[in-house]
Amino acid sequence: MTPTQKDGPRSNQDIRVPCVQLINDEGQHQGVVATQEALAMAAEVGLDLVEIVPNTEPPVCKIIDLGKLKYQTQKKAAEIRKKQKVIEIKEIKMRPNVDVHDYEVKLKAIHRFIGNGDKVKITLRFRGREMAHQDLGLKLLQRVKEDTSEIAKIEAEPKLEGRQMMMVIAPK
């Protein structure tokens, strides 16, 4: 019968080596000690013997509260997950003959998205005869590029895909 695999470091009776490098509950190095003696020292202060570095010879063990160690490990993992920022791609849709005020509103939105650390995909949709004036769309995207040059860099240059011209910018 095989023992079930526990999560986390080995502790107390799970440590099966004859001797360990011991660090006491105050963080002082005690040297190489017999495992049974280390277990007795841990029991004396009411704490657990926990294997910190298992792949050394002999393994490094520390006298510490196992519940507290698991709690701190979970807390660190949660903190790391919280700090991770998922970069989203926000999309701004425009037409080639956009009005001045509409352009300014779209530009404010682009600035807000870049300020939040997101990438922005600017899409120009051409309808009907507008396809004959792709140069207007390219000029508009160049204008967006110039207006956002101090806060963003171009990740994907303007390119035409079907009836749409698109460009992707990212925060600097």
UniProtKB/Swiss-Prot annotation:
It is found in: Cytoplasm. Belongs to the IF-3 family. NCBIfam families: infC (TIGR00168). It comes from the Bacteria. The keyword Methyltransferase does not apply. Keywords: Cytoplasm, Initiation factor, Protein biosynthesis. GO terms for molecular function: ribosome binding; translation initiation factor activity. GO terms for biological process: ribosome disassembly. The keyword Protein biosynthesis applies. IF-3 binds to the 30S ribosomal subunit and shifts the equilibrium between 70S ribosomes and their 50S and 30S subunits in favor of the free subunits, thus enhancing the availability of 30S subunits on which protein synthesis initiation begins. InterPro entries: T_IF-3_C_sf, T_IF-3_N_sf, Translation_initiation_fac_3, Translation_initiation_fac_3_C, Translation_initiation_fac_3_N. Monomer. It holds the Pfam family IF3_N. This is Translation initiation factor IF-3. GO terms for cellular component: cytosol; membrane.
